[in-house]
Design a protein with these regions (language model features):
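Transmembrane helix boundary and interhelical loop/hinge segments in multi-pass membrane proteins
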Residues: 116-137, 417-436
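Anion-coordinating catalytic cores for phosphoryl-, nucleotidyl-, and glycosidic chemistry
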Residues: 154, 209, 430
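Selective transmembrane-helix segments that form parts of the transport pathway or gating/packing helices
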Residues: 141-170, 440-472
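Transmembrane alpha-helical segments and their membrane-interface loop/helix boundaries
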Residues: 1-114, 159-417, 462-602
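Intracellular alpha-helical coupling/juxtamembrane segments of multi-pass membrane proteins
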Residues: 24, 41, 127, 137, ...
C-alpha cells in the first residue's frame, strides 16, 4: 500500500529554497505572449476570461467529426430495426453514399479552420500594444517577427489537429474498411490538407490585400471580408445535406463546378489514396489541383505576410488620418426621429450614444458581422434547393424557405445587436449616466434609457428586414408575389421584429455598452441549448401562420391584435423587472451585492 508523502515542517520547506522558475529564452517568452493574446483578447472575451471559454471551444471543435463517425456505425453495421428497411446481412452502403461520408469530414475541416482563422483575423498582425510596448524593449525586430510567425503556426496547427484527430479514433470501427491503412492515410491527408488550405487562404488573402491596399483602405473593407468569409464557410457546411445529393452528378459528369470548389479537391485526395489506381479519373485531377493549390496558397501567404507586417507597423507608427464621421444623408432621418420616437432628451441622447459607439469601437461591429454572416448563410441554406434531373443539377427556390428566411433575418439581427449591447469591457461612458441619473435611476428615467436601445434595435432590424424582403421578393416563387402574400409577410416580419426585440431585451437593465462583466462564467452548453430550442420555434412561426393569415381580412386583424397584445404583455413585464431593479439600494462601482442578496437569484 502506497503511503502519502510526508508533510515537511516550515523550517524544512524554507531550507529547500525558493522555487526556481524554468529558464526560458526571449524567443520562447515572445511566442507564449502572442499565443496568450490569441486566447485573451477583447473580441473573444471582453471580461478577460477567454482561456477557459476557448478551451471549451477547442474541445467542441473536435466533437462534430467524432460524433458523425460514431453515428455512422449502424449505417455500416446494421442491427435489428436500424437503419429502417435494411437486413442484418446487408452489403456495405452504396458507393456514392460512402463518398458523401468522406466528403463531410473534408468539408468540416475546411469550414472549421476557416472560421477560426477569420475570428482571429486582427491578431495575426501587430497592434498598438506591440508597437509602443514591445518595440521599446531590447528585442530585435527579426526575433519579434519570427516569434509572431511561430505563434501563428502553433495556433493553426493546434486547431488543425484538434478538429481532425478525434474522428480517426472511431472511423476504423465504424467504416470497417477492407484496407484500413489506405482509409486512415487518405482521411488524414485529405482533412489536414483541407483545413490547412482554408487557414492559409485566409491568411494569404489578408496579407495580399494589406500589402496592396495599405492599412487605411484595408480597414474599410476588413469587416466586409470577414462577414463574407463567415457567410460562405457556414453556408457551405449548412448546404451539405442539399449538396450531397448532387455530388454524384457533379463527379460523374466531370462538371467544372468541382474544380472551382476547394473541398472537392481534397475529396479527390481522399478517394485517390483510398481506391488507388481503380479510382475515377476525375479524382486524380482533383487531387493534383488540390496539391498545387495548397502549395501555391502557402507560398503566397509566406511571401505576402512580411510585406503586410511591415506596412502595418509603419502605419501604426505614423498613425491613422482623421476623418469626419458625420453623415449629411442621416440628418433628415434624425430630424424625423427627433420629432417622433426621440422626443424625450434622455432617449435621444442614448440613441445617438449607441450610434456613435458602434462607429467608434470596432469590436462591436465585429460581433454584428459574425452574427450577420451566420444569419445570411442560414438564409441561403434555407432558400436554395438542388435537384438532379437526368444527370443535370438544377437550382430551385423554396417557398417555405423564403417564409422561414423572414424569421431567420429577424432573429440573427436582433440577437447580434443584443450581444453587442450587453457586452462588457467598454464602460468608460457608464459614469456619466450614474452621475446624472443616479444608480439605479428613477423608474421613468430608467425606462427612457432602456427604451432608446429598443428603439434603435427595432429601427435597425426593420431596415434590415425590409432590405431582405425586397431581395427575397425578386427570387420568390409566383405564389409569394401577390399583394395578399406581401401584406401578410410584412405583418409577420414587423411582428417578429417587435416581439423579438421585446423578448431579447426583457432582462436588460443597463444602458447599452455600459454593462458590468458577469461575476459567474456563463454555461456555454446551456446558452447553445437555448438558441437551439428557441430558434426553430421562431422559424416555425412564419411557415405555419402565413397561409392562415392570408386566408382573409378577419385572420389578418386577429394576427395584428395578437401581436399588439403580446407586445403590451412583454412591455408590462419589462417595466415590472426594471421597477424591481430601481428599488434596489445603489452600489458603488466595485461594491459587491452579496451581503444584501446572499448570492440568491430572484
Amino acid at each position: 500500500m502506497m503511503s502519502e508523502p510526508e508533510a515537511l515542517s516550515l523550517s524544512a520547506q524554507a531550507a529547500l529554497g525558493a522555487v526556481q522558475a524554468p529558464q526560458r529564452s526571449q524567443f520562447s517568452l515572445l511566442v507564449r505572449h502572442f499565443l496568450e493574446r490569441f486566447f485573451n483578447h477583447e473580441t473573444a472575451s471582453p471580461d478577460g476570461d477567454a482561456k477557459s471559454r476557448l478551451i471549451l471551444i477547442a474541445v467542441a471543435t473536435g466533437i462534430p467529426g467524432f460524433m458523425v463517425a460514431l453515428y455512422l456505425f449502424p449505417v455500416y453495421h446494421p442491427f435489428i430495426g436500424w437503419p429502417p428497411g435494411r437486413p442484418l446481412n446487408a452489403d456495405p452502403p452504396p458507393y456514392w453514399l460512402q463518398v458523401n461520408h468522406h466528403f463531410f469530414f473534408v468539408l468540416y475541416s475546411f469550414v472549421a479552420l476557416g472560421i477560426i482563422t477569420v475570428f482571429e483575423w486582427d491578431l495575426f498582425f501587430p497592434d498598438l500594444l506591440d508597437v509602443f510596448v514591445l518595440t521599446t524593449l531590447p528585442i530585435q525586430d527579426r526575433r519579434l517577427f519570427l516569434a509572431r510567425v511561430a505563434a501563428i503556426g502553433i495556433f493553426i496547427v493546434g486547431f488543425l489537429l484538434d478538429a481532425n484527430l478525434l474522428a480517426p479514433l472511431v472511423i476504423p470501427a465504424s467504416f470497417d474498411p477492407p484496407n484500413l491503412t489506405r482509409l486512415l492515410t487518405g482521411h488524414l491527408l485529405a482533412v489536414l490538407a483541407a483545413g490547412l488550405f482554408s487557414a492559409a487562404f485566409i491568411l494569404a488573402l489578408q496579407g495580399v490585400l494589406l500589402s496592396a491596399l495599405g492599412e487605411a483602405l484595408f480597414r474599410r473593407i476588413s469587416l466586409l471580408l470577414q462577414g463574407l468569409s463567415i457567410t460562405v464557410l457556414v453556408m457551405v457546411l449548412l448546404l451539405f445535406p442539399v449538396l450531397s445529393g448532387a455530388v454524384p452528378a457533379f463527379l460523374q459528369s466531370g462538371s467544372r463546378i468541382v474544380f472551382y470548389c476547394p473541398p472537392f479537391w481534397f475529396l479527390g485526395i481522399y478517394q485517390r489514396v483510398l481506391e488507388g489506381p481503380a479510382a475515377l479519373p476525375i479524382y486524380s485531377r482533383l487531387a493534383q489541383t488540390g496539391c498545387v493549390a495548397l502549395a501555391v496558397t502557402i507560398a503566397i501567404a509566406m511571401l505576402s505576410y512580411p510585406i503586410a507586417y511591415l506596412r502595418r507597423v509603419r502605419q501604426l507608427v505614423v498613425g491613422p488620418g482623421t476623418h469626419d464621421t458625420r453623415s449629411w444623408v442621416a440628418r433628415p432621418a434624425h430630424g424625423l426621429l427627433h420629432a417622433t420616437l426621440l422626443r424625450d432628451p434622455v432617449r435621444r441622447a442614448v440613441f445617438h450614444f449607441i450610434s456613435q459607439t458602434l462607429l467608434r469601437v470596432q469590436r462591436y461591429r465585429i460581433y454584428l458581422v459574425l452574427y450577420g454572416g451566420v444569419g445570411l448563410s442560414v438564409v441561403v441554406a434555407s432558400v436554395l434547393r438542388l435537384s438532379v434531373e437526368q444527370g443535370q443539377v438544377r437550382v430551385e427556390i423554396s417557398a417555405d424557405g423564403v417564409r422561414a428566411a423572414i424569421a431567420i433575418v429577424a432573429f440573427w439581427t436582433i440577437a447580434g445587436l443584443r450581444m453587442a449591447f450587453v457586452s462588457p469591457g467598454n464602460r468608460q461612458g457608464s459614469w456619466a449616466f450614474g452621475i446624472v441619473h443616479g444608480r439605479p435611476p428613477q423608474l421613468d428615467t430608467a425606462m427612457h434609457l432602456l427604451q432608446a436601445a429598443k428603439h434603435w434595435v427595432l429601427l435597425c432590424s426593420g431596415l434590415v428586414m425590409l432590405a431582405a424582403m425586397t431581395a427575397l421578393w425578386v427570387f420568390a416563387p409566383p405564389e409569394l408575389r401577390g399583394w395578399r402574400a406581401a401584406a401578410c409577410m410584412l405583418l409577420i416580419a414587423g411582428g417578429l421584429c417587435l416581439l423579438l426585440t421585446d423578448f431579447f431585451f426583457i432582462n436588460v437593465k443597463t444602458v447599452a455598452f455600459t454593462g458590468e462583466p458577469a461575476r459567474e462564467q456563463p454555461n456555454l452548453a446551456l446558452t447553445v441549448l437555448k438558441y437551439f430550442t428557441f430558434f426553430p420555434i421562431v422559424i416555425w412561426i412564419p411557415v405555419a401562420s402565413e397561409h392562415w393569415v392570408q386566408a382573409g381580412i378577419r385572420h389578418f386583424l386577429i394576427a395584428l391584435g395578437a401581436i399588439a397584445a403580446a407586445h403590451l404583455a412583454l412591455e408590462m413585464l419589462h417595466r415590472r423587472i426594471i421597477q424591481e431593479h430601481c428599488n434596489m439600494p445603489g452600489l458603488e462601482d466595485d461594491e459587491d451585492d452579496f451581503p444584501m442578496k446572499l448570492g440568491l437569484r430572484y
